[in-house]
Amino acid sequence: ICAKCNSKVRDIDISIHFNSADHQRILDGKTMGSEVWVRDTTGVKGDLSKRICNQLSKIGFRNRGVKTTSGLWVLNKTSKPALLIEVCFVSDPDDAKLYKANKDNVAKAIVQAILNYNKKH
């Protein structure tokens, strides 16, 4: 994935994923919602990540916020700023149901966050 990203002309890399939790945490009422992972929150990464979380929360996903890590390959090995969006926890029945009912709205929310970021900058 990183090699493919690095071979293209772009400003940012956005990877869309779905989260999952172990069986002990599936129904705990806490392990649900959207989050965006970045290596750090400088520049476009922090602002756009917050916007994406906020837009997804308007659909009804719990806003788990922006999280940082140095341990994800896709965030470390791309030559442009990178975001990894975890749309929801597919292991949580409520999250999975919300996603299935709002697939198009999820895509629109991510696009709207990008458009809002571009208007501001």
PLM region spans:
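Active-site-adjacent substrate-binding region
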Residues: 44-67
